[in-house]
């Protein structure tokens, strides 16, 4: 098995989002995808930003500039009917691609304020609501399709009316956002608590606290290869105790974190956790976290 193969993932991994290269799959990659879904039961999702209609799903020959792309999808600025029709076309293209490769759903990376791209769709609250109202008919718990719809990133910007459209809310609870990590970088139980409280306060009018909590997943940034091999960064308990990184790095801390409300969280995970594939043993800290969160019954 090579590090890039899905079958190399830890056995008990419930869900993985593919950030790049998730379309135009070779026969070998299709077989690998089927194998991990069928033999390990792992849900495999496509992942995309939605800064503008067509993001991630525009044919290359039309993705040359904004005007050509918008003409392809039928987007016309300030024309509500045209915009909604273009959104319908975009949602259908996403769904068609997911069904073509039999992915298990879509993970929307929703970062309107921090993704560095000026987006006509994701930076307009009304347009986001329109698009999610359309997309939820194809994917997610409202669609009866059996396909998942999850969202990660700036969860506090997700329209309240759309909260029930998602199977999971993935918090980017990163110790570091990018660049060279500081030697003291870390995360804490209290930060996880506040992230959960934030979305409970936002979505509490349309979902129960238990429903929100059980859909909430916390994730660490494993982009720094050396830190991925060490299981992340420092982890601090609610009482202020900073644990020994060699014993409980942040990835393991997130796995162990239990919400104070007594409800079960959705889970834990990592961005670019594939950097841990070369660990000894492979995915050492991810496996340790899975075992800590869901102890095996002997």
Q: Where is each model-derived feature located?
A:
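Secreted glycan hydrolases and related glycan-binding modules that recognize and/or cleave
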Residues: 1-298
């Amino acid at each position: 098995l090579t590090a890039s193969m899905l079958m190399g993932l830890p056995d008990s991994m419930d869900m993985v989002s593919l950030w790049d290269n998730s379309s135009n799959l070779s026969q070998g990659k299709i077989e690998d995808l089927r194998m991990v879904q069928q033999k390990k039961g792992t849900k495999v999702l496509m992942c995309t930003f939605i800064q503008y209609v067509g993001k991630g799903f525009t044919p290359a020959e039309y993705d040359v500039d904004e005007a050509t792309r918008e003409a392809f999808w039928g987007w016309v600025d300030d024309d509500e009917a045209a915009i909604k029709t273009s959104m319908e076309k975009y949602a259908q293209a996403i769904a068609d691609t997911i069904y073509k490769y039999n992915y298990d759903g879509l993970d929307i990376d929703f970062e309107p304020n921090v993704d560095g791209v000026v987006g006509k769709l994701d930076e307009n609250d009304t347009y986001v609501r329109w698009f999610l109202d359309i997309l939820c008919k194809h994917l997610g718990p409202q669609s009866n399709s059996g396909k998942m719809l999850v969202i990660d990133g700036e969860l506090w910007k997700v329209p309240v009316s759309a909260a029930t459209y998602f199977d999971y809310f993935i918090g980017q609870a990163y110790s570091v956002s990018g660049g060279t990590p500081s030697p003291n970088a870390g995360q804490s139980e209290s930060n996880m608590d506040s992230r959960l409280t934030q979305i409970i306060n936002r979505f509490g009018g349309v979902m129960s606290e238990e429903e929100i909590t059980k859909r909430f997943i916390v994730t660490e940034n494993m982009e720094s290869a050396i830190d991925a091999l060490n299981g992340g960064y420092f982890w601090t308990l609610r009482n202020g105790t900073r644990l020994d990184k060699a014993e409980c790095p942040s990835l393991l801390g997130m796995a162990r974190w239990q919400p104070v409300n007594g409800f079960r969280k959705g889970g834990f995970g990592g961005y670019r956790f594939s950097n841990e594939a070369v660990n000894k043993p492979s995915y050492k800290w991810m496996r340790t976290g899975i075992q800590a969160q869901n102890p095996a019954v002997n």
